[in-house]
Amino acid sequence: MKKTSYSLIKLIAFFLCGSFFSIAHAEDAHTLYLDTKDGRITIQLRPDLAPKHVERIEKLAKEHFYDGIVFHRVIDGFMAQAGDPTGTGLSGSRYLDLKAEFTDTPFKRGSLGMARDPSDKDSANSQFFICLADQPQLNGKYTNFGEVVSGMELVDKIKKGSKSENGKVTDPDKIIKLRLAGDNS
């Protein structure tokens, strides 16, 4: 009888541990950690809104593509933009551009959007922006694919650019690293 009870306890413990790890993994799914000089920004991605855009940023994060990339365009009251390896706003990753995944989900303070050429809705690649305030004029015109869930005060600290130069930043702040939750590299 004692042997059966002990086996039953082991079996229950095994299933409970498995459930705990599954829950922890589910909470990390589609979560990004963006580290800046001021601390960590946590972003929850939204594959329900834009699966291809989420897939792209996760792929690039796994490749450490964003490490050291600057916030090249930051406009006070509008957004902070990064993701161009040249820091000019004219480049992207080695992958093909993405087709737009527009939705009616509003761009609010903390929303994560994919930057693109304003004249080509299907030109998103690796550049993204974080809204510093609500931006209703972007709704249905840009791909909204996530939101800042902690660290928005750190986004507010990112060095701003000149409004007269469309947000171009002199000596811009950098992304120290951008990782998927659970990636400890």
Language-model segment annotations:
Residues M1-I12:
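Bacterial N-terminal signal peptides that target proteins for export
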Residues K10-F20:
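Bacterial N-terminal signal peptides
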Residues S22-S185:
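Cyclophilin-like peptidyl-prolyl cis-trans isomerases
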